[in-house]
């Protein structure tokens, strides 16, 4: 197959950041994706309906002229989140609440420190029809970073799902065999997103032959057995797994430093890289469900009506992109060849 046409896809997990950065990130995603679930981990975090609406306005202002791209907003859950916060957010069009264990990722220090205290909030979310999006890692310093996802499933996620079966839960950016199995075996109200980097790479790509800071993300890349389990999950075509890039931009100097930031900025190549993965797996027929259908269905939103066409044509991801403030950012897969390319009119 040398060409494939898909229903216009959506990105069910990304980071736009804020300020000048929106001038880069919003057009990069809007070029292909109709909708995107926007993460709320700004400084300060998006904890109220009013903050979500204001952030949405800033994103809309950064859309390219003529674009009808739609940002889908989320609420940053903390131990101070109230039932009224959830009700107000739902009324304002916020589609989901995001659970970050405190310290799990960029700008998450204000997040949840006592998870059990949030169960009443999860109940309200279920009643309101608001989804729970989960960064599924424990954060205690004595727990090995490669074990934190499995530990979160055992300690928390299994209990949340069991206690509130009507709550729709997205286990975001899963990275392990255990996570893929948990989602596959859970009820129809549990799904997961998978990033391009966790399908394409494993921890050798981070650590062998030198540290590769632009492959560093959280949750961290795992052993190849976990990479293969994720590939197997998407190759089944199961509606429980769908596209979420976790595209997460950081300026070059913040990645290439003594204490580099976590995140892969994949917006310029994500769909093409997913196509490469599915092609390599002999599962191109499953790409449309993963990229364009399963997420919308799980969120209870209409499927998109447009289409995007990819052709089998080699191109090279740019080494750098210059941000509106003049600083460079290194995109994911920089300088590497990709086998699929979006067909432009």
Swiss-Prot record:
Q: In which pathway does it act?
A: Pyrimidine metabolism; UMP biosynthesis via de novo pathway; (S)-dihydroorotate from bicarbonate: step 3/3
Q: Kindly indicate whether the keyword Lyase belongs to this entry.
A: no
Kindly state which keywords UniProt assigns to this record, in alphabetical order. Hydrolase, Metal-binding, Pyrimidine biosynthesis, Zinc
Instruction: Tell whether Zinc is among the UniProt keywords.
Output: yes
Q: What family does the entry list?
A: Belongs to the metallo-dependent hydrolases superfamily. DHOase family. Class II DHOase subfamily.
Say what the protein does: Catalyzes the reversible cyclization of carbamoyl aspartate to dihydroorotate.
Q: What is this protein called?
A: Dihydroorotase
Q: Which organism is it from?
A: Shewanella frigidimarina (strain NCIMB 400)
């Amino acid at each position: 197959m040398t060409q494939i046409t898909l229903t216009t896809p959506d990105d069910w997990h990304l980071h736009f950041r804020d300020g000048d950065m929106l001038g880069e990130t919003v057009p990069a995603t809007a070029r292909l994706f109709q909708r995107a679930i926007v993460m709320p981990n700004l400084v300060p975090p998006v904890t109220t309906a009013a903050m979500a609406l204001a952030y949405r306005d800033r994103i809309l202002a950064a859309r390219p002229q003529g674009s009808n791209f739609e940002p889908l907003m989320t609420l940053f859950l903390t131990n101070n989140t109230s039932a009224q916060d959830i009700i107000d957010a739902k009324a304002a069009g916020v589609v989901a609440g995001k659970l970050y264990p405190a310290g799990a990722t960029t700008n998450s220090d204000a997040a949840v420190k006592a998870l059990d205290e949030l169960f009443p909030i999860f109940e309200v979310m279920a009643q309101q029809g608001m989804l729970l999006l989960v960064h599924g890692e424990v954060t205690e310093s004595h727990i090995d970073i490669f074990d934190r996802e499995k530990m979160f499933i055992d300690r928390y996620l299994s209990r949340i799902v069991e206690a509130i079966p009507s709550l729709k839960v997205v286990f975001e950016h899963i990275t392990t065999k255990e996570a893929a199995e948990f989602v596959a075996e859970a009820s129809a109200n549990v799904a997961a997103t998978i990033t391009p980097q966790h399908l394409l790479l494993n921890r050798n790509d981070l650590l062998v032959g030198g540290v590769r800071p632009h492959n560093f993300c959280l949750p961290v890349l795992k052993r190849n057995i976990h990479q293969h389990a994720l590939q197997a999950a998407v190759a089944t075509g199961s509606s429980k797994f769908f596209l979420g890039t976790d595209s997460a931009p950081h300026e070059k100097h913040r990645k290439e430093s003594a204490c580099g930031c976590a995140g892969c900025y994949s917006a310029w190549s994500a769909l093409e890289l997913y196509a490469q993965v599915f092609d390599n797996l002999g599962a191109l027929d499953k790409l449309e469900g993963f990229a364009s259908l399963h997420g919308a269905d799980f969120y209870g939103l209409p499927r998109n009506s447009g289409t995007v066409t990819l052709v089998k044509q080699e191109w090279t991801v740019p080494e750098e992109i210059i941000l509106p403030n003049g600083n460079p950012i290194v995109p994911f897969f920089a300088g590497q060849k990709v086998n699929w390319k979006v067909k432009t009119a």
